[in-house]
A protein has these predicted regions:
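Conserved ABC transporter NBD signature motif
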Residues: 83-91
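Short helical segment in ABC ATPase nucleotide-binding domains corresponding to the A-loop/adjacent helical element
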Residues: 124-132
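Helix-to-loop junction immediately C-terminal to a conserved catalytic motif
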Residues: 75
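ABC ATPase NBD coupling module
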Residues: 34-41, 92-109, 133, 138
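ABC-family P-loop ATPase nucleotide-binding domain
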Residues: 1-40
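The feature captures the beta-strand-to-loop junction immediately N-terminal to the Walker
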Residues: 60-62
Length: 139
């Protein structure tokens, strides 16, 4: 049986005043028109996904569709407005800042829209570079 590595359930990120209260007042499922009429900016709306151990995930979509925001919510670089995010069965919304730093350093990797590769390295060597910096044996 495959083990879930990260699970996101009903993740929301709204920008505006007291977005948690707004979601609660609409039973956690306002439609897009209601969100916009109320003056909120929806960055992520009710996103759910599951990534199993050993899987590689690529989020693709139009510019401004919420891909980077969702990944930042998954790693808690920004706080989601609502929803559940579990990593290895642990609730990331309850994790301390220290636990999050360790997670980001050792267990979760991300490549965002604006990145640079080392031109003198192969693609594989670029991908392995963070492990090399940490002293992990690549054999």
């Amino acid at each position: 049986m495959t083990k879930s590595k990260i699970v996101c359930r009903n993740v929301w990120k709204l920008y505006g005043p007291e977005p948690e209260k707004f979601l609660a007042s609409h039973d956690g499922e306002p439609d897009l028109a209601t969100i916009k009429e109320s003056g909120y900016i929806p960055a992520v709306r009710n996103a759910s996904l599951e990534v199993n151990e050993g899987e590689l995930v690529v989020l693709m979509g139009l510019s401004g569709s919420g891909k980077s925001t969702l990944v930042r919510c998954m790693s808690r670089l920004i706080e989601p407005t609502a929803g559940e995010i579990d990593f290895d069965g642990e609730d990331l919304r309850a994790a301390s800042e220290r636990e999050l730093v360790e997670l980001r350093r050792h267990k979760m990797g991300m490549v965002f829209q604006h990145f640079a590769l080392f031109p003198h390295r192969t693609v594989l060597e670029n991908v392995a570079f963070p492990l090399e910096v940490q002293g992990v044996d690549l054999a």
